[in-house]
Amino acid sequence: MKKEIIIVTISLGNDGAERILTELARQWVHDGHHITVIQTSPNRYGNEYALEKGIEQIEIHTTSSNKVIRFMQEIKELIKILKTRPNATCLSFLSASSFILAISSWFIKNRIVFSERNNPRKVPIGWHQQALRNFAFRFADTLVFQTEDARSYFPKSVQNRGVIIPNPINGKLPPPIEGEREKTIVTACRLHPQKNLPMMINAFSMLADEFPAYKLVIYGQGVLEDELRAQIKSLNLENRILLPGFASNILEKVAPCSMFVSSSDFEGISNSMLEALGMGLPVVVTDCPVGGARMVIKSGENGILVPVGDTQAMYEA
């Protein structure tokens, strides 16, 4: 049966949640459903991910520089849109958009689904942001969690409305490379403290002399770019550790590499890890909360799990 699904997000910026929602929207529209993506703050957070043809896009543009007034404008506009589509199921992946949708739910009749995409103990940052997230979850008809560990953080009233659904994987992955791979160790993520990229860089520096033909390529953008470049320069590895930025064709970039690595201190389920596994790359990742990596990797069989924060273990792996 054809369904109407509305995905509410602050933007289509270059983060994992936005990437998943674009993949889901693409699949659902192929399945014959009517899909609408509403961006509440497109101007402030960017549009790195393009939506497939056939997906309706609505952008809410606000004019005030005052955060409170802007927030109220976003809610007002969202309510106006949703009142014209009372039979649609509304889905939100991010805490900010979930809070906007939760307030809007007081005035609409739509079914509401929220999805927790990270470690709820760590994200969002700050007790007040977490309180807003927890408040928003009270108004969801259904909540989606990636792992049981993530669901267990919340009170029983939330857990009882929750389901565990791991991340989907792109159905159009490049096939595994046959023959010799490029001598490149690769990762793709936000340049953010959560990802603990300094540990990855230090681990690579420990093996750089042993394997002079190899390089480390870190795709992504973020607040730590200058700090990471300074670290790389201090290690005299500017020609061996590269930060090329965001890549819209990331699958083609990763497919020929020799190894995928993730050093996150915490994570939901890494999209880039799943895609690397699907393309046949050897994978070395930290066994971090909320348990997404250990759901799909049996260490020593289809990848290697290393302790969080253990540079030596990552080097040895």
Question: What do the predicted segments below correspond to?
Answer:
Residues 298-300, 304-311:
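Conserved acidic donor-binding segment of nucleotide-sugar-dependent glycosyltransferases
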Residues 246, 265:
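Aromatic "clamp/platform" in nucleotide-sugar-dependent glycosyltransferases that forms part
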Residues 15-23, 183, 190-212, 218, ...:
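A conserved mid-protein helix/loop that constitutes part of the nucleotide-sugar donor-binding site
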Residues 82, 106, 112-144, 157:
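A conserved, positively charged/aromatic
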Residues 92-98, 116:
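Short His-centered aromatic/hydrophobic patch
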Residues 282-287:
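Short hydrophobic beta-strand element within catalytic cores of glycosyltransferases
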